[in-house]
């Protein structure tokens, strides 16, 4: 499977989510390579890439979008506090993942994201998405929903 296009060796077949084993830079142990974690953030990003590639192919265009392995995770700490880890898992020589300081804002962001994710399509979901994007801009976090 190509880690950027997510295309398999079979024509017109892509792989996303937990069925993938995508090597990333670095080693777990000398004899064990690192692989991209099995996390929803990566499956979501992979689905967006594959959908855009299929749409381009159907319309006769050459697809150029690639999966970049940028990932993030909110880390709940209790008492309405959370941390935020994010990074580029394809960075060389090893994944570049950073952890932001615990704070209430990350907890609020997590709650908003959960509400957005579970909301039916409509004005409420759009407003939640706009709020998340605004918060992302304020905190220097790229947001792709």
Can you say where each PLM-predicted feature lies in the sequence?
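Internal hydrophobic alpha-helix adjacent to the cofactor/substrate pocket in enzyme cavities
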Residues: 39-69
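Flavin (FAD/FMN) cofactor-binding core of flavoprotein oxidoreductases
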Residues: 65-83
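Short C-terminal domain-edge/linker segments immediately following a structured domain
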Residues: 7, 44-49, 104-109
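FAD-site-proximal beta/loop scaffold in flavoenzymes
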Residues: 1-45
């Amino acid at each position: 499977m190509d880690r950027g296009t997510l295309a398999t060796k079979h024509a017109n077949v892509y792989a996303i989510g937990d069925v993938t084993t995508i090597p990333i830079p670095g080693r777990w142990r000398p004899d064990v390579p690192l692989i991209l974690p099995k996390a929803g953030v990566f499956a979501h990003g992979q689905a967006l890439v594959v959908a855009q590639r299929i749409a381009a192919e159907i319309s006769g265009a050459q697809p150029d979008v690639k999966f970049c392995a940028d990932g993030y995770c909110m880390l709940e700490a209790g008492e309405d506090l959370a941390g935020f880890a994010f990074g580029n898992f394809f960075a060389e020589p090893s994944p570049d993942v950073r952890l932001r300081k615990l704070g209430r804002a990350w907890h609020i962001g997590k709650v908003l994201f959960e509400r957005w994710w579970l909301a039916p399509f409509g004005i409420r979901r759009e407003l939640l998405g706009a709020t998340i994007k605004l918060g992302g801009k304020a905190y220097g976090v790229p947001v792709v929903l």
